[in-house]
């Protein structure tokens, strides 16, 4: 029970720091074994997280499974655009594209916008879509990404972030005026 209490408490602190933004539990890869990952995800949900990246925990506890693809997904394709397009075709109802594998502002966000435009032009409803930032100056990158998305007519696209986040970093990013509205937390 100590492990789960610790995770639930930490999740609660992170949720409070996010001030209404959604927190997704991304802790499986850092868990001390599969059981710790499953029960840690459950504890994070008790602490206020809106979903988990842990598919088994989602099945066992009937909680929402949320997340995006990894950098390795993008690197397994000949180029970033093809990776994004393939992912969007597989998950048109929940399309979140990880835009910082190569160059966030010069290729990642522009390629995401290209895919979103193609989805819109094909008549695919854009309801739950956005981008994820996982490195760099998250406050700056989110502000610049928001400008690019808005200029392209995707002002309802969300910006999610991960990257060793905890309640203190989330508070700092919010104080800097970041444009992030959902957070993937698990390393810390």
Range-by-range predicted roles:
Residues 179-188:
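Glycine-rich phosphate-binding active-site loops on the catalytic face of alpha/beta enzymes
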Residues 71, 162, 186:
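Residue-level "edge-of-site" marker
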Residues 176:
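Conserved dinucleotide-binding and phosphotransfer motif residues
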Residues 95-97, 159, 183:
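Hydrophobic/aromatic residues located in beta-strands of well-ordered beta-sheets
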Residues 173:
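Hydrophobic alpha-helical positions that pack around
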Residues 163-164, 181:
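Conserved acidic functional residues
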């Amino acid at each position: 029970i100590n492990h789960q209490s610790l995770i639930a408490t930490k999740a609660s602190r992170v949720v409070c720091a996010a001030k209404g933004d959604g927190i997704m539990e991304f802790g499986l890869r850092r868990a001390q074994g599969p059981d710790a990952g499953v029960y840690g995800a459950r504890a994070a949900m008790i602490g206020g997280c809106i979903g988990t990246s842990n598919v088994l925990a989602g099945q066992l506890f009937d909680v929402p499974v949320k997340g995006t693809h990894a950098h390795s997904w993008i690197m397994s394709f000949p180029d970033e655009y093809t990776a994004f397009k393939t992912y969007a075709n597989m998950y048109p109802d929940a399309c979140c594209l990880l835009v910082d594998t190569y160059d966030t502002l010069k290729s990642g966000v522009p390629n995401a916008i290209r895919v979103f435009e193609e989805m819109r032009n094909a008549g695919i409803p854009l309801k739950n879509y956005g981008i994820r930032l996982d490195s760099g100056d998250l406050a700056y990158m989110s502000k610049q990404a928001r400008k690019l998305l808005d200029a392209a007519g995707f002002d309802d696209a969300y910006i999610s972030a991960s990257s060793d986040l905890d309640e203190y970093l989330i508070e700092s990013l919010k104080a800097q005026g970041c444009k992030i509205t959902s957070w993937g937390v698990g390393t810390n």
